[in-house]
Amino acid sequence: MGTRQTKGSLAERASPGAAPGPRRERPDFWASLLLRAGDKAGRAGAGMPPYHRRVGMVQELLRMVRQGRREEAGTLLQHLRQDLGMESTSLDDVLYRYASFRNLVDPITHDLIISLARYIHCPKPEGDALGAMEKLCRQLTYHLSPHSQWRRHRGLVKRKPQACLKAVLAGSPPDNTVDLSGIPLTSRDLERVTSYLQRCGEQVDSVELGFTGLTDDMVLQLLPALSTLPRLTTLALNGNRLTRAVLRDLTDILKDPSKFPNVTWIDLGNNVDIFSLPQPFLLSLRKRSPKQGHLPTILELGEGPGSGEEVREGTVGQEDPGGGPVAPAEDHHEGKETVAAAQT
């Protein structure tokens, strides 16, 4: 699969000394990339998970910058921003409107996108600007694709999906975690997962279902089993094909305190069109973990303590690739440094 390439493979293919061929120089590559992705989605129904398209756009953006095609790279970045829910089209909007985040489902991605916009539109003559761009693109590619999942599974990735699933569901969950991330799942596979959760549910603290190809209907199929896990604290559903419709279902089920009784976070980043989290969703999570004391949100510019209970605690609640929480940012610049450190 295309996204299995290593972080250095793109650099080897598009090194500064290499003369690109005519096909790779096409100025409308980004447009054809989007058209091909849309055509595949039309033929395959739900289509590929959106991270395939987004990673391809990041890699093409880096290639354009290496070739000095900053104007085209800026246009491609605009399309990537819109694909990720950052609908603004001007640089000022990107740098200032999104300098403080409100209820974003994936603040790490948005922070990296803002940093990319700065390097593309406001390049600094001093220092290794290209090296900084390459690092940002590596971080964004890593965050938007299942590289970390493949690395965690190590030996399992060489097996077929059914063998991987069987290995993970054999015995008790290690470290109280059911980690199926990166393993493509079918509706029939979910029956086995449901049976496993019912059998071992008392031991499960975390369920990882990122990059498994889940659709809204598949999540709804799992919800009865997931919502009754007594110790579950984190549920990862990132990198799938989920839409805002399932977010409404999750918000409704969280209104019942007997469902997901101990959950503190549900990761819905890098899906089709889930870009922000409604306050009822966040408040329901907060009620389940009052000692945590923070909503996973950053105040918008101009908002203050008088803006309401739901935005009184302005910190980002997310996890880095290693699974630990990222420290809250006091302002945008500090947040950028924190995120970069977490992704290095």
UniProtKB/Swiss-Prot annotation:
GO molecular function, one term: ubiquitin-like ligase-substrate adaptor activity
Biological processes annotated in GO: proteasome-mediated ubiquitin-dependent protein catabolic process
UniProt LRR repeat ranges: 204-217, 229-242
Region (Disordered): 1-25, 295-344
Record-stated family: Belongs to the LRRC75 family.
Transmembrane segments: none
Disulfide-bond pairs as recorded: none
Biased composition (Low complexity): 11-21
InterPro entries in the cross-refs: LRR_dom_sf
Record organism: Homo sapiens (Human)
Record SUPFAM superfamilies: RNI-like
Keywords: Leucine-rich repeat, Repeat
Full protein name: Leucine-rich repeat-containing protein 75A
Cellular component GO terms, alphabetical: Cul2-RING ubiquitin ligase complex; cytoplasm
